[in-house]
């Protein structure tokens, strides 16, 4: 006759099989963002196991199917803080680098390893220090950072009890007064113990002793709260220290925080607790307190007491680990991973912003770990010119993560522009064309809503061009001055040489990084202007005007149609723009930034080689100038020091601008000889002419002497 048959014959209800409510994973959205950020910025290709904290709490007011939630909150990877009312579960996560690695992972071995951690802690007693391991979990995941898809699978490792445990009687509940006293004592216990102890504890009813004192306090029965005993709460480890000594068996309780709201079914953590009870406590019967009460509703009894007994006779302690199960089932009830698409829950603007950062951060994983991406991201870039060069430069800057881009241009979009200038469309040309600068800024925002782009319509004052409206010219100058001061980098991308003169002067005076690109039919030059010397003594690199012995003048006067348009091979602008932005990036990776020296050439003159300076530079060399020739598809790296008599960056010019501001500019625009004289170029020209005259005179004298000599020989 079976045990159940014997019980029935004796008129006793047979023991009931225990059924447990498994945990249901619940990942909050901030956790995904935290995991993605950790993968990009910290873990990179390291897919080692990381600790993670889970939280659960009594959920008696929820429907049973929704009550046993294991919550993974935003700070689960970085914080061990446990909010009031929650219970801690110690878990781990392994985020694989590829979906193939995720699929190939040995799920059985991973589960056994997680179970072994619990089993070993039970055997050696360390479980008493970290009872939260009894509700531990493991997560396998793969985060597709490009598509914002998260594949994951939770395991809640559970040790099987052999023989199994069964109900040994009807469940019991406490009265409202008993529950209130219990909740108060549990709160005191939690206040005095580590959060890892909060989920599992011992409880006992201590009868009032004869006499007037209860725990050292006078008894007061007049308040109606006398329940005939006091609650005493202890940690699991106190069992082996005699916590229940002298306490009647029916007043001894082994408790765990039960998140289940099922009427008679406890939640998952009890299964591991029962293994501990048999292995460490050597018990075959136990009163299990499924603690479901909360401080806020402590007068509403919700906890239940399950009297449990082992189905079979006691087995001797064993070192062999029991069977382990625990993989979470898919909502379809199958044992398989879950997939969530985060894109539908996220702000598209934020997705675009993170996607840009993703492409850049991936470069740091294997190729260039020392790359300083923040140096580019934080830049404020001013683009003088919103045409062909401005369009391509801005797109390349966004590719490097630059968020602040400002355009300055005085022109409108014409019908010839859209095919060469990718920020404009056919509709922008209608009705005389829209202003380029604001339209270019608008186009950037459509490409990446996270970029802070703006456009200003103003005319840059130019040498050699008459001042027709002094008030307007001064207003344009002051606006340009404000913009240059407010930005870190100034790009000179205009059509004419003379339009680059004033921004060169202003950029040098304000200590800004000035980048310059100019195009020919099949040639181009990209360069960085030399920065102002730190101490005013050392030499610096030259600017766009340092090779000139004349000041800029009106280059647009008397131009034919082919001279009025930028006549260049269509690919030249894209090549030059990309190279200019890459040069800026290399500058910012150098420890001296804009003060970085030009690279030194080694090897034969016809085939020079350039070494990284410093050797660990993240991107390579930092050229001063690159001149490209599309006819033979060659580039030349050139460097040159600043010219003491330069019309734009020499000390007299920059000093006059700093001291006089607009008055200097007005005089330079109205007096064609002012810049020549101030810079010293006029004197250089006079000396050159004097030398030329002297050379001409010497040549005439030599010819005359030769003729006389010839005559004498005859």
Curated annotation (Swiss-Prot):
Lineage: superkingdom: Eukaryota
Keywords, alphabetical: Autophagy, Cytoplasm, Protein transport, Transport, Ubl conjugation pathway
One GO MF term: Atg12 activating enzyme activity
Swiss-Prot/TrEMBL domain comment: The GxGxxG motif is important for the function, possibly through binding with ATP.
NCBIfam families per UniProt: E1_like_apg7 (TIGR01381)
The protein's assembly and partners: Homodimer.
Protein name: Ubiquitin-like modifier-activating enzyme ATG7
Organism: Pyricularia oryzae (strain 70-15 / ATCC MYA-4617 / FGSC 8958) (Rice blast fungus)
